[in-house]
């Protein structure tokens, strides 16, 4: 193993395994963004709250552009297991059904760090009023 490979292996062992799942909203029907927000608030948030092996999940969206789930897992094995099972059924997932298409990206990543700001984390099923 080269010194670069050794450094990379050592470095990634101390970081958190993540996964990004992204759908395009460019051709999604009108009302899709609201339907996604309602689904997250009414179903998906509860499904992932307290999920074993998951550190946290965020749902992000740019109206008319994309919707994504960002997951951070406790171990790479848990990330790999979730990625494998999700990928196998991605086309039938709730997000795909609401949007009308499969994800355009299912990508593992490494979360280097997370900083909690002075206002603290505000975990919520919805940030809309």
Pin down the residues of each PLM region.
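Short S/T/G/P-rich N-terminal loop/turn motif that feeds into the first structured element of a domain
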Residues: 1-66, 77-84, 101-129
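A common structural junction motif
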Residues: 89-97
């Amino acid at each position: 193993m080269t010194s670069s490979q050794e450094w990379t292996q050592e470095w990634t062992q101390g970081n958190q395994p993540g996964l990004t799942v992204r759908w395009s909203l460019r051709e999604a029907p009108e009302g899709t963004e609201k339907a996604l927000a309602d689904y997250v608030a009414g179903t998906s948030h509860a499904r992932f709250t307290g999920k074993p092996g998951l550190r946290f999940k965020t749902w992000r969206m740019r109206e008319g552009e994309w919707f994504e789930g960002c997951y951070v897992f406790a171990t790479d094995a848990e990330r790999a297991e979730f990625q494998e099972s999700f990928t196998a059924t991605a086309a039938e997932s709730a997000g795909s059904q609401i949007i009308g298409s499969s994800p355009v990206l299912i990508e593992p990543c490494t979360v280097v760090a997370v900083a909690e700001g002075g206002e603290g984390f505000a975990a919520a099923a919805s940030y809309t009023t």
